[in-house]
Amino acid sequence: MPRVKRGVTARARHKKVLALSKGFRGRRGNVFRIAKQAVMKAGQYAYRDRRTKKRVFRQLWIARINAASRELGLTYSQFTNGLKKAAIEIDRKMLADLAVHDKAAFGSIVEQVKAKLAAA
């Protein structure tokens, strides 16, 4: 069986890792052994933070809704309870967007919620 020389595949593998580590500081971006570790760690952070991102955005939306509803006289928990009673099915992302960009629309939703809470 003929001898297999791995120069081509090794170079391709190295190029792939170094391309992924482009923009990293110092030897993390241009020395293969260190770049390989840096790319692995970056991948772990990316995997973890794709999941964390969902939690962080939900927290942000809740904080924005809470702040906007408190300005209009309701806490977040009272507001969400009123939304359920008023059968208004708008998700937190849309409510937070309304609270920031369209205060009049958010205010009208809060008024509907207050009316439903007062009736109950």
From Swiss-Prot:
UniProt GO cellular component terms: ribonucleoprotein complex; ribosome
InterPro entries documented for this protein: Ribosomal_bL20, RIBOSOMAL_L20_CS, Ribosomal_protein_bL20_C
Coiled coil: none
Record key words, sorted: Ribonucleoprotein, Ribosomal protein, RNA-binding, rRNA-binding
A molecular function (GO) term: rRNA binding
Tree of life domain: Bacteria
GO biological process: one example: translation
HAMAP family xrefs: Ribosomal_bL20
Function, as annotated: Binds directly to 23S ribosomal RNA and is necessary for the in vitro assembly process of the 50S ribosomal subunit. It is not involved in the protein synthesizing functions of that subunit.
Family: Belongs to the bacterial ribosomal protein bL20 family.
Name of the protein in its database record: Large ribosomal subunit protein bL20
Lineage of the species this protein comes from: Bacteria, Pseudomonadati, Pseudomonadota, Betaproteobacteria, Burkholderiales
